[in-house]
Amino acid sequence: MKIGIPKEIKNNENRVGLSPSGVHALVDQGHEVLVETNAGLGSYFEDGDYQEAGAKIVDEQSKAWDVDMVIKVKEPLESEYKFFKEELILFTYLHLANEQKLTQALVDNKVISIAYETVQLPDGSLPLLTPMSEVAGRMSTQVGAEFLQRFNGGMGILLGGIPGVPKGKVTIIGGGQAGTNAAKIALGLGAEVTILDVNPKRLEELEDLFDGRVRTIMSNPLNIEMYVKESDLVIGAVLIPGAKAPNLVTEDMIKEMKDGSVIVDIAIDQGGIFETTDKITTHDNPTYTKHGVVHYAVANMPGAVPRTSTIGLNNATLPYAQLLANKGYREAFKVNHPLSLGLNTFNGHVTNKNVADTFNFEYTSIEDALK
């Protein structure tokens, strides 16, 4: 199979679809890999590293797309839609529930789009989302602490406090991978940490995991309001696979927060959980202030630590990429059901129900689409 690795063009997206070691694994199995020149530079992988791994370096974006399968990190931007073609396998993060134009373009061009974030194991876990959730979760506390500093617009709070001075209060909405990792860093900094989640079993697991060092609270509108207004830092870490994020924190709740407090919306690439995160920000200009509260709404947080992120992502995605390349998508879906759940569009059909419902597209089951 001919596989393309284009350079990411989203603002400050420094990750790359495959590391040289991933390229080597695919080339070793007889596949041809085309890497756009400088695609790996943001992650400190040189063209020469890819050439040594067996890749062919191409000097035009179009050549990296003129392949059987494209492996990326982030969803294609509008300038890349012109490269879509029938039967192209696109393997990347898509977050289509927040991307109507992209969904339409994938359908119109009959692209076989497989979203990392909807590949799902029988236990409900999301193996290709996990590494980036870990990165984003850990980063969310770090950037929150940074923007609590006075010269960054915050109220001048040190999350860990000092003897005789109260600790900063961190509230995390969502106790999944991202929320759990946010809590680990917040605890490490010495903050007072509360996690809200709708799943009582998950709250029990978090109690055990953190040995009672975090406060675990059932997530409902009253509790969210109560804890949000008292917090110095609120982190939104809620995920419904393939669906738009629920709006859990209202504008009125934000108005009750202290001036100079900070919110970090990890879920912004799925629409966000805060009513006031009504725009996506970038690493170049990561925050804005509304009702006195600093809003951080960067959709590609792991792009700021690309070396760690690329290697972690490659570790997770490579076995699935090899399966697709070695067996073809039909056989790969047959032998690996979790991978088949990643299929979002196929031959002009939307095959993810959450995406179809969000934009009123006709839904076609994966089984029916593949007949």
UniProtKB/Swiss-Prot annotation:
Pathway(s) it belongs to: Amino-acid degradation; L-alanine degradation via dehydrogenase pathway; NH(3) and pyruvate from L-alanine: step 1/1
Enzyme type, top EC level: oxidoreductase
SUPFAM superfamilies: Formate/glycerate dehydrogenase catalytic domain-like (SSF52283), NAD(P)-binding Rossmann-fold domains (SSF51735)
GO MF annotation terms: alanine dehydrogenase activity; nucleotide binding
GO biological process per UniProt: alanine catabolic process; L-alanine catabolic process
InterPro entries: Ala_DH (IPR008141), Ala_DH/PNT_CS2 (IPR008143), AlaDH/PNT_CS1 (IPR008142), AlaDH/PNT_N (IPR007886), AlaDH/PNT_NAD(H)-bd (IPR007698), NAD(P)-bd_dom_sf (IPR036291)
Keyword annotations: NAD, Nucleotide-binding, Oxidoreductase
UniProt-listed Pfam families: AlaDh_PNT_C, AlaDh_PNT_N
UniProt: substrate binding residues: R15, K74
Catalytic activity annotation: L-alanine + NAD(+) + H2O = pyruvate + NH4(+) + NADH + H(+)
Binding-site residues, NAD(+): 133, 177-178, 197, 219, 238-239, 266-269, 298-301
Active site location: H95, D269
GO cellular component, one term: cytosol
EC number: 1.4.1.1
The keyword Nucleotide-binding belongs to this UniProt entry's keyword annotation: yes
Known partners and oligomeric status: Homohexamer. Trimer of dimer.
Family affiliation: Belongs to the AlaDH/PNT family.
Function: Catalyzes the reversible reductive amination of pyruvate to L-alanine. May play a role in cell wall synthesis as L-alanine is an important constituent of the peptidoglycan layer.
Name of protein: Alanine dehydrogenase
Organism of this sequence: Staphylococcus epidermidis (strain ATCC 35984 / DSM 28319 / BCRC 17069 / CCUG 31568 / BM 3577 / RP62A)
The encoding gene: ald
